Amino acid sequence: LVSDHMVLQRHKPNVLKGSGVPGRSVLLEFAGKEYRTVVNQGGHWRIDTEPLSPGEPRQIVAISGEDTLQVNDVRIGDVWICSGQSNMEFSVGSFLWAKEEQKKAVEGDSWYYTLPNNLDLIPSDELPASQWKAASGNDLLQLSATAYFFAKHVQPEIGVPIGLIVSAWSGTAIE
């Protein structure tokens, strides 16, 4: 779930993971701090960050050998899981008044990550490619309407960025 525009949970340690060459060191720069670890024999690394408070957008830089990964516009706020069937999958763009709602959406308050529907019987640590998007502009139309209206109601009350992780698939069992 790591991409530009992602939202991380405030006031809690956050886990950042990656993969690389076994035995190679990893330097992670985030929120004015440096974290170091080593890629394990399975080719994976993990860093637990310190808890952070909301503030200006941040950047994450991970460096391992000649490889550098940069993640921009990282927000610290509240992250919510939005899971369900057709009622959660129904998008803002499906409403008759979608264009009016699109004009009212406040840019910079909420972002979302929609997990692609993927049926696989073999467990995997990797997710199909997706990215965090703003809950405004043209991207708003693809967002779950239930998730959007929840964020629209909650964000002004708590006053921090909202991250919505949407996992919705019509006609499937919730478990």
Language model features: what each stretch is:
Residues 1-175:
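Cell-envelope and extracellular/periplasmic
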